[in-house]
Amino acid sequence: MSQPNSQQPTIVKCPTCQNKVVWNTESEFRPFCSKKCQMIDFGEWADEEKSIAGAPDMSDSDGWSSEPY
């Protein structure tokens, strides 16, 4: 008779400090290891040190006008 599969907890790396974090409901700040690492990451996004790649911003030469239609 085989034993039931005991699931190993999912372990991820904290995006800020690379410490190991158990991914479960008790990990309050997941994927971060702590509130400090969470706030460091938030600050980097707020300061625009991090961004998601997208289309370039429109410039004045793109035909944009502040004049109403």
Swiss-Prot record:
- Free-text cofactor note: Binds 1 zinc ion.
Q: Name one Pfam family in it.
A: YacG
> Keyword Zinc on this protein?
yes
Annotated GO biological processes are:
regulation of DNA-templated transcription
GO molecular-function terms, A-Z: DNA topoisomerase type II (double strand cut, ATP-hydrolyzing) inhibitor activity; zinc ion binding
Q: Which UniProt keywords apply?
A: Metal-binding, Zinc
- State the needed cofactors, names only: Zn(2+)
Protein residues bound to Zn(2+): C14, C17, C33, C37
**Keyword hit for Nucleotide-binding:** no
* Listed Gene3D superfamilies: Erythroid Transcription Factor GATA-1, subunit A (3.30.50.10)
> What is the annotated role of this protein in its UniProt record?
Inhibits all the catalytic activities of DNA gyrase by preventing its interaction with DNA. Acts by binding directly to the C-terminal domain of GyrB, which probably disrupts DNA binding by the gyrase.
Q: Which family does it belong to?
A: Belongs to the DNA gyrase inhibitor YacG family.
Q: Quaternary arrangement and interactors, per the entry?
A: Interacts with GyrB.
Designated name of the protein: DNA gyrase inhibitor YacG
